[in-house]
UniProtKB/Swiss-Prot annotation:
Pfam families for the chain: Ribosomal_S13_N, Ribosomal_S15
UniProt family annotation: Belongs to the universal ribosomal protein uS15 family.
Highest rank taxon of the organism: Archaea
GO molecular function, one term: structural constituent of ribosome
A Gene Ontology term for the protein's cellular component: cytosolic small ribosomal subunit
Listed name of the protein: Small ribosomal subunit protein uS15
């Protein structure tokens, strides 16, 4: 499938193996894994960073076969889910960096175009999240950007 704002094709990548039962090498109980997730989230880590740390340091390939629930559901149970979805938050930070660069380099037209593409991607995501009720209908991007 093609990329959104370019004529290039997408990148191929490895797919995660579908595992339905708990792997035998995991030495942590369900409660210990949930405590690790909550602790990492309270340290300020995002969901993807938590998943990477669980995979690389604790040899837990995913929370679904182990806990029978997704990582976001564990965070939702403990009221630690962020108000803004992670992918939208990353786009907002990218846009802020691009605008900071543009304020210092006013004639950088390539970066101006990239900032426009980031903004259109953010607006598309916001429409989707409002439609699926992940964001409230009165949520405003302007409040976040200032």
């Amino acid at each position: 499938m093609a990329r959104m704002h370019t004529r290039k094709r997408g990148r191929s990548g490895s797919k995660r193996i579908e595992v339905r039962e708990r792997p035998s090498w995991i030495q942590y109980s369900d409660d210990e894994i949930k405590e690790m997730i909550v602790k990492m989230r309270k340290q300020g880590m995002t969901k993807s960073m938590i998943g990477i740390r669980l995979r690389d340091q604790y040899a837990i390939p995913g929370t679904r076969p182990v806990l029978h629930m997704k990582l976001g559901q564990v965070l939702k149970e403990n009221n630690l889910e962020s108000d803004v979805p992670e992918d939208l938050q990353a786009l907002i930070e990218r846009y802020k960096r691009a605008m900071k660069h543009l304020s210092l380099n006013k004639h950088d037209m390539n970066n101006k175009r990239k900032a426009q593409l980031i903004m259109s991607k953010m607006l598309r995501l916001i429409r989707y999240y409002k439609r699926t009720s992940r964001l409230p209908q009165d949520w405003s991007l302007e409040r976040v950007l200032q």
